[in-house]
């Protein structure tokens, strides 16, 4: 073999090993990729039953029904469409009607989303980007987490005194 043919064989072998490694990585990742959908996308696209995805939106007011053995039924809405959800387990402490959530699970034949994980928003300004985009597209987005700015505490509100200041005032005799 000539030097040139050995180099070509080595390059081809390295290319084959890299292609195999890339194929293994992609096949391993395909099982862990879970897509996010809003209720409007679920209604419009007709998601196939058994497809695993994340459903994000707001818990519809008046929809939470607690059953025996930690069974909970509620509806998730993006104000354009609503998807019924069934979940069994402990809900996050921040879960309540009107709050943003992301649930992971599958859609059954009847159109009910069977969640195995429910995540609630964790501060008053957080909302999943996809949910916020869907609300903005519908013209229903409110800046500041939907709270009335006039009810917010003024920035120069009195702050509680520190222990040092209080002790300093008392020690003067």
Swiss-Prot record:
The chain crosses the membrane at residues 8-28. It is a single-pass type II membrane protein. Residues 145-162 have a biased composition (Basic and acidic residues). Residues 134-173 are annotated as: Disordered. It is found in: Cell inner membrane. Residues 1-7 are cytoplasmic. It comes from the Bacteria. Heme chaperone required for the biogenesis of c-type cytochromes. Transiently binds heme delivered by CcmC and transfers the heme to apo-cytochromes in a process facilitated by CcmF and CcmH. Belongs to the CcmE/CycJ family. This is Cytochrome c-type biogenesis protein CcmE. It comes from Methylorubrum extorquens (strain CM4 / NCIMB 13688).
